[in-house]
């Protein structure tokens, strides 16, 4: 499904088994199930799972080009989508996002703990705010990129996409002297 204007609503059902391979007449080469170039995509239920795209591409589930409006709510599930070479590629947000947050949360159908949103954001997005609220539902969001994690910040509302501190994750081992 390609969104170039207007509104696409997904309230129930499953988008599965789709594949985005080559650039089509609209210049779309991403978004196995949904490609959002402009317009609005609202997902308050249903699942987007088991879709694929070419190796090295993003958005086997949903690819959001710069600037569009994405609203998530209810028990929406975006998971299990992969590139041809096996990389997790669920909800991917491209470079040049125009707003300070990546996802708007639905006020008509509030996000629930049953939702599952796996996400990958452009590589220069350390500290990018995913949502402006729902810190209690942080675990609904999962990073597709092993170098990033979903976090909250003390004293700030919202959920963030943050580069992992890999040095903090490595245990410190004192040097051991070997006797030969």
Task: Pin down the residues of each PLM region.
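Extended, compositionally biased low-complexity polar/Lys-Gly-rich tracts
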Residues: 1-4, 31-40, 70, 90, ...
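Extracellular beta-strand/beta-solenoid scaffold signature
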Residues: 1-2, 19-37, 52-65, 84-96
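Generic signature of intrinsically disordered, low-complexity segments enriched in small/polar residues
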Residues: 5, 21, 44, 66-68, ...
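Right-handed parallel beta-helix
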Residues: 7-21, 40-52, 69-82, 104-110
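A detector of low-complexity, intrinsically disordered, Ser/Thr/Gly/Pro/Ala-rich segments
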Residues: 14, 38, 42, 47, ...
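Extracellular/surface-exposed low-complexity segments
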Residues: 73-180
